[in-house]
Amino acid sequence: MAFTFAAFCYMLTLVLCASLIFFVIWHIIAFDELRTDFKNPIDQGNPARARERLKNIERICCLLRKLVVPEYCIHGLFCLMFLCAAEWVTLGLNLPLLLYHLWRYFHRPSDGSEGLFDAVSIMDADILGYCQKEAWCKLAFYLLSFFYYLYSMVYTLVSF
């Protein structure tokens, strides 16, 4: 049993992947809350309730924006570590999501500092549905990756 750089990468990736799973679960909960608030017909005509709703939507979008860059950076760190450790299969599995993250980041709206989640555009049912599907797909990817990293870590520790 030998401790190699690849084993260290898998250990660190396990911990960071758990944090990414929590990030994505938070995204799913936030999108569900936005969808529920969007469909709630109670107090539609009350202006005070409308202002409160808008503040709640802006608060949720602000929190969502704060998680985007750390998620992308952590996933980029995964790819960089696996590139340095010459773990080509693992890098190949992570590369499509990294490219999607880069595409999504560089194609974000450039009309200010709103970032990916704008309080006005997120309430469009199509955009909200897309974001929710994206979060569920990321959750599936990160969960499968977590168990793959666990298996690879054990295999790397035992095989050398």
UniProtKB/Swiss-Prot annotation:
Main location: membrane
Bilayer-crossing regions: 11-31, 73-93, 139-159
Segments in the Cytoplasmic topological domain: 1-10, 94-138
Keyword check for Membrane: yes
GO BP term (any one): vesicle-mediated transport
CC annotations in GO: dendrite; membrane; synapse
Any one Gene Ontology molecular-function term assigned to this protein's record: signaling receptor binding
Tissue: Expressed in the odd-numbered neuromeres (r3 and r5) of the developing hindbrain.
Any one Pfam family match given in the protein's UniProt record, by short name: Cornichon
Membrane topology term: Multi-pass membrane protein
Side Lumenal, residues: 32-72, 160
Compartments where located: Membrane
Keyword entries, A-Z: Membrane, Transmembrane, Transmembrane helix
Disulphide bridges: none
Function, in words: Regulates the trafficking and gating properties of AMPA-selective glutamate receptors (AMPARs). Plays an important role in the proper development of cranial nerves by facilitating the secretion of HBEGF.
Quaternary context: Interacts with HBEGF.
Family named by the database record: Belongs to the cornichon family.
Protein name: Protein cornichon homolog 2
Upper lineage: Eukaryota, Metazoa, Chordata, Craniata, Vertebrata
